[in-house]
Amino acid sequence: MASSAVQICSNALLLLGDKPINSFDEGYDRALLCSNLWDNARQAVLRAHPWNCAKARVSLAPETETPAFDWSYQFALPGNCLRVLFVGETGVPEDYTIEGRRILADVNPLYLSYIYDNEDVASWDALLIETMQRYMAFSMAYPLTKSATLRDSMYQEYANLLKSAKAVDGQEEPPETVGDSPFIDVRR
């Protein structure tokens, strides 16, 4: 199993029928292409699904400056936040909005669950690694081969693998339960 960005990119190159690389700094066009695409590709694939290996939780304190209207507090999103999953605690969602890199809400503190930019490939699930290899192959297919057909084929492989990986990754989560709510209590 690939345990580094370079190994993932090498495997993606092999999927395209190209030679592997040993480093992003090799001086070959394919190594430079891998290096240029890696960060954005990683972030796109991590954003595509709430991967268990890229989830984080944090309690945020409000900034000193308050929003001009509608909301009582504003909170800076963590620097490594790629996607907000949930705002609130104990299964009770809070109302909020996102503006730029800030969350506006009427609660203090703000409990945030999110996807972070997990750069530690060694901590990734095997299916996430396979999915990332297909995404890199898709991203590099046209620049390396000038073949739209190969690019489209690699995208289809990526999409199919992502679908399977989401199903497997999602099965590791316990089933969602209905949290405490005044609306639910009335029904009991």
Regions found by a protein language model. Give the residues of each.
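Short, extreme N-terminal leader segments that mark the start of a protein/domain
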Residues: M1-N36
